[in-house]
């Protein structure tokens, strides 16, 4: 029986030598929130703890400044 090997998760921010995650970079932040607007946990994305904290802070700042929605569109 063939075994399925899950792809190893890696931190994108470590690989790209990112110093600080910017709250104005909405395109990057959108990759780390769900369709309903929740922050995706690091066990799913593979982001290191240091960058996960920065990511959460940047997403919350972007939400406060209305760059990102708090929730999805209600109709």
UniProtKB/Swiss-Prot annotation:
**UniProt entry tagged with the keyword Ion transport:** no
Q: Which Pfam families match?
A: Ribosomal_S18
Q: Name one GO molecular function term.
A: structural constituent of ribosome
Q: Which GO annotations describe the biological process of this protein?
A: translation
Sorted alphabetically, the keyword list is:
Ribonucleoprotein, Ribosomal protein, RNA-binding, rRNA-binding
Question: GO CC: one term?
Answer: cytosolic small ribosomal subunit
InterPro entries associated with the record: Ribosomal_bS18, Ribosomal_bS18_CS, Ribosomal_bS18_sf
Q: Tell me its family.
A: Belongs to the bacterial ribosomal protein bS18 family.
- Give the record's subunit note: Part of the 30S ribosomal subunit. Forms a tight heterodimer with protein bS6.
**Database matches in NCBIfam families:** S18
Read off the HAMAP family from this record: Ribosomal_bS18 (MF_00270)
User: What this chain does, per the record?
Assistant: Binds as a heterodimer with protein bS6 to the central domain of the 16S rRNA, where it helps stabilize the platform of the 30S subunit.
Q: What is this protein called?
A: Small ribosomal subunit protein bS18
Q: Which organism is it from?
A: Pasteurella multocida (strain Pm70)
